[in-house]
Amino acid sequence: MNAVEITERMDQLSENSIPEWGTMQVSQMLAHCSAFHDIPLGNAFPPRGLLGRLIGRFAKPMFYNDKPLPHNMSTIPTIIIDDQRQFMAEKEKLEQQINIFQQGASEKFSRHPHPFFGKLTAEQWGKGIYKHLDHHLKQFGV
C-alpha cells in the first residue's frame, strides 16, 4: 500500500464531501475503513457467515486482484457505520492505522480469517486493504 498516496487523497476530503454513490457520510466512510483495518490488525474478529464459508474462497481473488470493487457491494455487518462520527477524529484514526501498516504491521497480520474470503496472506491483505481504501476514496471523488 502506498501510504503517501492514500493520505494525500484523504487530505482532499472535507467534512462536507458528498458521495458519488451510496449513503455513507464521509465521517462514516472513514470510520468504516478503520473498522475494516481492525480485522487484519487483530483488534476485531467478525465471525464467518455461511455464504462466506461456502463461496468465499472462490470469490477471494476479487479482494486482491487489479479490478475495482463494484459500487454498492455488500459489506461485513460488524463494520457498517450508521451513527454520527467526528470527521477529524475518524480521519486521524485511519491515518494512524495506515501508518501502522506502512511500518511493517503486515508481517503481524492476524491469522483470523476475513469474514467472507477466509484465510489471506499478508500480501493479499495488503492489496485488499489498498483496494478497499481506493474504492471508498473514489466514492468521495478523490
Model regions and ranges:
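Short amphipathic alpha-helical segments and their helix-coil junctions
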Residues: E5-N16, S34, D38
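Short, helix-capping/interhelical loops that line the mouth of catalytic, cofactor-
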Residues: N43-A89, G104
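Charged/polar positions within long, soluble alpha-helices
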Residues: N99, Q103-S106, K138-V142
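Globin-like tetrapyrrole-binding proteins
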Residues: M1, R9-L13, W21, K67-P68, ...
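A non-catalytic, amphipathic alpha-helix used as a structural packing/dimerization or gating element
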Residues: A89-Q96, K131, H135
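Conserved, structured core segments of small domains
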Residues: I18, L69-N72, L94-F101, K108-S110, ...
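Short, contiguous alpha-helical
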Residues: I18-Y64, H112-V142
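Onset of an N-terminal alpha helix
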Residues: M1-T7, V26, Y130
